[in-house]
């Protein structure tokens, strides 16, 4: 039997999603909790491997299990064995041809900037703080040059192992809600550090250091050195993963919880 789960986590204290030797990861914590419920080792496969310090409200995983458990065991039961910064949001049985990574048609991220002269205390690890005023309208204008199919070499990390830098960008929207500037970005897939490098570049536009048209020029150069610096991990959330309707996965609020959808 194959089970899919929706996972939410605060990535601040973890080395990232992927299990690694001698360091704490979200995957390892989740697999331990699932194994406790199944009473046997469980391995999970995820939609996207987030980096150190990156959060998730819409991560999707799947695993195979041959024990009979009520579905509530994979939500409330698993949550009882997870730390407070990781939670299962939903669970459902899926067909054997479902794969959390390879069945996905798009991923959606939100990068959240707390744009205030004073640093936050409550949301210190859940947002990226920038003290100078940001013009979110110019950031949004610049972001529209990213929509469509492009070679994203200019916002690709040097250590990226993807075979191709080409990606299909569905949307990039920049908006403001009070002191929060939100970059909402969706693509079929992402190269390494793509969202954070885009965020760093858009911040340069928002600060008035570059014009919106500069973003188009950055893409055309196909050179990581011309784009903005990599924005901090703290503000980045994997908020949703799209799948074909045939799999019947539940939907849930994008989050994070302090932002309306």
UniProtKB/Swiss-Prot annotation:
Enzyme class: isomerase
Chemical reaction(s) catalysed: uridine(38/39/40) in tRNA = pseudouridine(38/39/40) in tRNA
GO BP term, example: tRNA pseudouridine synthesis
NCBIfam families found in the cross-reference section: hisT_truA
Protein name: tRNA pseudouridine synthase A
Catalytic machinery residues: 51 (nucleophile)
Protein family: Belongs to the tRNA pseudouridine synthase TruA family.
Source species, domain of life: Bacteria
Gene that produces this protein: truA
Matching PANTHER family: PSEUDOURIDYLATE SYNTHASE (PTHR11142), TRNA PSEUDOURIDINE SYNTHASE-LIKE 1 (PTHR11142:SF0)
Transmembrane segments: none
Keywords per UniProt: Isomerase, tRNA processing
């Amino acid at each position: 039997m194959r089970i899919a789960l929706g996972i939410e986590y605060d990535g601040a204290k973890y080395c990232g999603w992927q299990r690694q030797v001698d360091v704490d990861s979200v995957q390892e914590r989740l697999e331990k909790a699932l194994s406790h419920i199944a009473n046997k080792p469980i391995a999970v496969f995820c939609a996207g491997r987030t980096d150190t310090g990156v959060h998730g409200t819409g991560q999707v995983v799947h695993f195979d299990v041959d024990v009979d458990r009520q579905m509530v065991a994979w939500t409330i039961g698993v949550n009882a064995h997870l730390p407070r910064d990781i939670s299962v949001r939903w669970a459902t049985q899926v067909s054997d041809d479902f794969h959390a990574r390879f069945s996905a048609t798009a991923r959606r991220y939100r990068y959240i900037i707390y744009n205030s002269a004073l640093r936050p205390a409550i949301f210190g690890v859940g947002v990226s703080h920038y003290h100078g005023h940001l013009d979110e309208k110019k950031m949004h204008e610049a972001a529209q040059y990213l929509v469509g199919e492009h070679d994203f070499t200019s916002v690709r990390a040097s250590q990226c192992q993807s075979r191709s830098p080409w990606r299909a960008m569905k949307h990039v929207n920049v908006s403001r809600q009070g002191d929060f500037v939100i970059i909402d970005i969706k693509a079929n897939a992402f190269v390494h550090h793509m969202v954070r490098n885009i965020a760093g570049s858009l911040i340069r536009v928002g600060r008035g250091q570059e014009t919106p048209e500069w973003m188009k020029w950055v893409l055309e150069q196909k050179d990581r050195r011309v784009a903005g610096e990599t924005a901090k991990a703290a503000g980045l959330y994997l908020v949703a993963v799209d799948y074909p309707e045939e799999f019947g996965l539940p939907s849930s609020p994008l989050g994070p919880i302090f932002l309306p959808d």
